[in-house]
């Protein structure tokens, strides 16, 4: 069986990173569902196709919470965390070949890193922009994004409007800034190891010193 792996939320400062893997014996079966790069699909299209993929193909999902990522970053780089998560998503599917989206400038180096966490009988092929090259990766990308969007929506219901969770989102930064200002610490859904959080904490501490 051939598999594809991709993640959503690697660079977000709030919420989890979601990794999905999808298996198939014939890529044309995935193409027939309308699988494409998840970024090019509307939210409704992603949700429908994600449901179709889950109903017809084997898949697995690995979720790394903000706390998980902070703990792992004590001893691993973010690329290593993603590689390990990619490998963990592949294991339940027992595939012989897996296409993964390369999270390193060097495709070969990323292949080696994922392989180091993967079963020895699974060949890893890492490519940049794999989600637009290989249907199984496109399918995994869709599932990962839909699952992450669902989680972010749930977090927003619990914590208030957190935006997309990415540092580039003004809504996310406004939420983080206000939370840190009022609580003197980041929320549990924040990745405290991120420079974004460290900078906001530093600004809060500097402001407190000036007030004093």
Swiss-Prot record:
Main location: cytoplasm
CDD domains registered for this protein in UniProt: RNase_HII_archaea_like
Pfam families, alphabetized: RNase_HII
Keywords assigned by UniProt, alphabetized: Cytoplasm, Endonuclease, Hydrolase, Manganese, Metal-binding, Nuclease
Domain (RNase H type-2) ranges: 1-206
InterPro entries in the cross-refs: RNase_H2_suA, RNase_HII/HIII, RNase_HII/HIII_dom, RNase_HII_arc, RNase_HII_hlx-loop-hlx_cap_dom, RNaseH-like_sf, RNaseH_sf
Keyword Transcription attributed: no
Cofactor-binding details, from the entry: Manganese or magnesium. Binds 1 divalent metal ion per monomer in the absence of substrate. May bind a second metal ion after substrate binding.
Compartments, record wording: Cytoplasm
Cofactor: Mn(2+); Mg(2+)
Any GO molecular function: RNA binding
EC number: 3.1.26.4
Reactions catalysed according to its record: Endonucleolytic cleavage to 5'-phosphomonoester
A GO cellular component annotation in the UniProt record: cytoplasm
A single BP term in Gene Ontology: DNA replication, removal of RNA primer
HAMAP family recorded: RNase_HII_A
The name this protein goes by in its record: Ribonuclease HII
Lineage: Archaea, Methanobacteriati, Methanobacteriota, Stenosarchaea group, Methanomicrobia
Gene, per the UniProt record: rnhB
């Amino acid at each position: 069986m051939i598999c594809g792996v991709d993640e959503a939320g690697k660079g977000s400062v709030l919420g989890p990173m979601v990794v999905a893997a999808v298996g198939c014996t014939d890529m044309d079966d995935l193409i027939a569902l309308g699988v494409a790069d998840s970024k090019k699909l509307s939210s409704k299209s992603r949700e429908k196709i994600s449901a179709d993929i889950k109903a017809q193909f084997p898949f697995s999902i690995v979720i790394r919470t903000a706390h998980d990522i902070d703990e792992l970053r004590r001893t691993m780089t973010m690329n290593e965390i993603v590689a390990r998560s990619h490998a963990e998503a592949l294991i339940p599917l027992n595939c012989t070949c897996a296409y993964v989206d390369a999270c390193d400038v060097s495709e070969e180096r990323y292949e080696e890193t994922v392989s180091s966490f993967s079963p020895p009988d699974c060949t890893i092929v890492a490519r940049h922009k794999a989600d637009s090259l290989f249907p199984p990766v496109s399918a995994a990308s869709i599932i990962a994004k839909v699952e992450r969007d669902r989680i972010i929506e749930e977090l927003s219901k619990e914590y208030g409007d957190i935006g997309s969770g990415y540092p580039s989102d003004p809504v996310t930064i406004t939420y983080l800034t206000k939370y840190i200002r009022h609580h003197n610490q980041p929320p549990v859904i924040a990745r405290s190891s991120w420079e974004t959080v460290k900078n906001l904490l530093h600004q809060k501490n500097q402001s407190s010193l000036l007030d004093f």
